[in-house]
């Protein structure tokens, strides 16, 4: 499985060749030719010879799956990736994403952005709890369509990831409004929050908590959150002075200027 350290030799060679292909264009520091790479007079003929500085530059150019493979090559590469990696997307993983997160979260503790979008729900609470336990610098998290998650995930994020500025839990239908209220009280730096389709989560009670705690909020998606009314939206208006956009598509209880029977993307003046 991707992320394990027991790679075959051909896997390492393939990884090396791919890294060298991408690394060949980096600021003249590398010269490709005759199967060798030179850097500051040093010949690099094998994956073990790549200096850590060069490795980090190259890993910034390749896809996330290759980055994970690279972290399993040897201890030196693992340490370099763990210290240098701040953004990771696992949306390409269509099977076993939950186990992959459980494996990677303890290693990639410097992550600031983590994208875990799914077409078929895979993530479970234990994976999110692992993220919260190890990735305390996380600022951007996408958990959209994580149908299997429960309130336990939001409680864990509240305690482990207080620096979140952007959170996407659209389509996570199992979360309750009390769990979102709890999250808002800890994650007070939130600027972008996507609650589209979170019918149980987005209520006037939850919006009141967001207005009370998340004063830096700028963008909020409440699409198809049918329990939201004027009361909740007004609490946002009073409590979030930086608020710029609110998506109220399908919010049938909204009246007056904000018509809920049609898609409404409200621009705050």
Residue ranges and their predicted role:
Residues 102-106, 128-134, 154-160, 180-186, ...:
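A structural signal for leucine-rich repeat
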Residues 74, 89-138:
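F-box-proximal linker/hinge
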Residues 50-62, 76-77:
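Short hydrophobic alpha-helical "box" of cullin-RING ligase substrate receptors
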Residues 88-90, 114-117, 141-143, 167-169, ...:
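Conserved hydrophobic beta-strand positions in leucine-rich repeat
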Residues 1-49:
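CRL adaptor-proximal regions
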Residues 94-100, 120-126, 147-152, 173-178, ...:
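Short, solvent-exposed loop/turn at the beta-strand->alpha-helix junction
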Residues 67-83:
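Short helix-loop-helix/strand-helix junction enriched in hydrophobic and basic residues
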């Amino acid at each position: 499985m991707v992320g394990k350290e027991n790679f075959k030799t051909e896997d390492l060679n393939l990884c090396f060749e791919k890294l060298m292909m991408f690394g060949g264009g980096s600021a003249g520091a590398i010269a490709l030719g005759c199967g060798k790479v030179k850097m500051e007079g040093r010949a690099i003929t094998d994956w073990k010879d790549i200096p850590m500085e060069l490795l980090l530059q190259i890993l910034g150019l390749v896809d996330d799956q290759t980055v994970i493979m690279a972290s399993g090559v040897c201890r030196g590469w693992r340490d370099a990736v763990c210290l240098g990696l701040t953004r990771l997307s696992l949306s390409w993983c269509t099977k076993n994403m939950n186990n992959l997160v459980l494996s990677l979260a303890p290693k990639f503790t410097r992550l600031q952005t983590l994208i875990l979008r799914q077409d078929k729900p895979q993530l479970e609470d234990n994976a999110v709890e692992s993220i919260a336990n190890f990735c305390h610098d996380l600022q951007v998290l996408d958990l959209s369509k994580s149908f299997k998650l429960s309130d336990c995930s939001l409680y864990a994020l509240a305690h482990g990831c207080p620096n979140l500025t952007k959170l996407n839990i659209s389509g996570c239908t199992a979360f309750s409004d009390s769990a979102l209220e709890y999250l808002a009280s800890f994650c007070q730096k939130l600027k972008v929050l996507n609650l589209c389709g979170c019918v149980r989560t987005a209520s006037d009670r939850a919006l009141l908590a967001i207005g009370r705690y998340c004063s830096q909020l700028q963008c909020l998606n409440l699409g198809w959150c049918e329990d939201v009314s004027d009361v909740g939206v007004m609490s946002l208006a009073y409590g979030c002075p930086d608020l710029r956009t609110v998506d109220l598509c399908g919010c049938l209880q909204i009246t007056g200027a904000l018509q809920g029977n049609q898609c409404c993307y409200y621009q705050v003046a």
